[in-house]
Amino acid sequence: MITYQTGHVPDLDAVIELYRASTLGERRPIDDRERMAAMLKNANLVITAWDGSLIVGIARALSDFCYFTYLSDLAVRVSHQRKGIGKELIRRTQSAGGPKTTLLLLAAPG
């Protein structure tokens, strides 16, 4: 069963490993630990998906919680894709942003 957490920023190594396992690591500075740590620290909305103790998805966003939410990273492990996890992370991000908030997600191919 997949569970979701809002506001909990997981261990940096776990997030980097997730990015690699989701292919998002191809487009993020995963070899620059300081930058990755800052990216996580400065996001004001982080929602994660868990399969037991394994992080399987993450939505990392910036929001003013009243008008606009920018979903800068959406990653789901390849092994857990096509199970609705990404859609649920998007839904929860939109909901956390507020009822009148516009959600922006720029997606890459693949």
Model-identified regions with their sequence ranges:
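Generic structural signal for conserved hydrophobic packing positions in ordered secondary structure
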Residues: 15, 71, 103-105
